[in-house]
Every structure is written in C-alpha cells, then in structure tokens.
C-alpha cells in the first residue's frame, strides 16, 4: 500500500530565512526545520484528541496539544500554545508578557503568515493539499525550535 504524502515546503524569516520541510503521512507530521547546521527533526502524531510528539530528538523538546472547542491548546517545549482556525489561523505562543502572536492565511495551496508584530518574522509555505493549520503549526514549532529552544 502506498502512503499518501503531502509535502510542506517553505521558509520562515528573511535574513537569513529558515528552511521548512515537512510531510503529512496519514496521521503523522514528519520533517526537518532549519539548515544543515541547526536543523531539528520533527515527528508528531495527529489524532482526534490533538497533536503530540517530539522535536529535535534526544536534546529536543516535547509537543503536547489538546483539541478543545476548535482550539489546539497545550505546550511546545516549555511555552504554552493556543492555535485557532483551519485556513485562517490565529494564536499565541508563550505567556502574556513574553509571548508571540501569530496569524496565517491559506489561499489554495499557499500559506502566508507572520509571527510577532511589525518586526516579527514572516513565513511562506506551499502546502500541497495539507490544511493551513498544519502548516502554521510547523512554522510556529520551527520558530520555537530555532529561536527560543537553545539546545
């Protein structure tokens, strides 16, 4: 039986940009974020209850998100995450004082978004049929993995 793969490719930030590559294989999100020197492996399970998994292997961090009332809520590493929406996605990574708001909009197979305010980082992804919330989740996790989790 051949697995259906939906490739997610794109970048986060501009100078320099962070490469994002992931694929959806049935109920798993697998991929790699970052370049050759700072790359982190991504392995997440998607279920009716939420998303869970690990990023960065042994020295990485856990992802544990629960689906409640149309919102994914939980933890990415030590930070809280709240993510709402499917093709128009909004949310927040972190607490009230040090957190980062994000927004993303899907148009067909393209996803464009921003983490943070005016000086925040933009991201652009090609989704190849994958829902926008998954692309946004990959971008937010990449941001945390490469900008906030220093291991």
Regions of interest found by a model, annotated:
Residues 1-43, 47-52, 58-151:
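Long terminal segments
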């Amino acid at each position: 039986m051949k697995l259906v793969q939906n490739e997610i490719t794109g970048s986060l930030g501009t100078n320099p940009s962070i490469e994002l590559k992931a694929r959806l294989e049935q109920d798993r999100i697998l991929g790699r974020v970052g370049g050759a020197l700072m790359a982190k492996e991504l392995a997440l399970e998607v279920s009716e209850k939420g998303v869970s998994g690990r990023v960065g292997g042994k020295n990485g961090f856990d992802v544990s998100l629960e689906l409640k009332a149309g919102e994914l809520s939980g933890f990415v590493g030590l930070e809280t995450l709240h993510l709402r929406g499917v093709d128009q996605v909004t949310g927040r990574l972190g607490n009230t004082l040090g957190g980062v708001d994000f927004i993303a909009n899907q148009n067909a197979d393209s996803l464009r978004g921003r983490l943070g305010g005016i000086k925040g980082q933009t991201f652009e992804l090609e989704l190849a049929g994958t829902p926008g919330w998954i692309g946004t989740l990959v971008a937010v996790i990449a941001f945390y993995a490469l900008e906030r989790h220093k291991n």
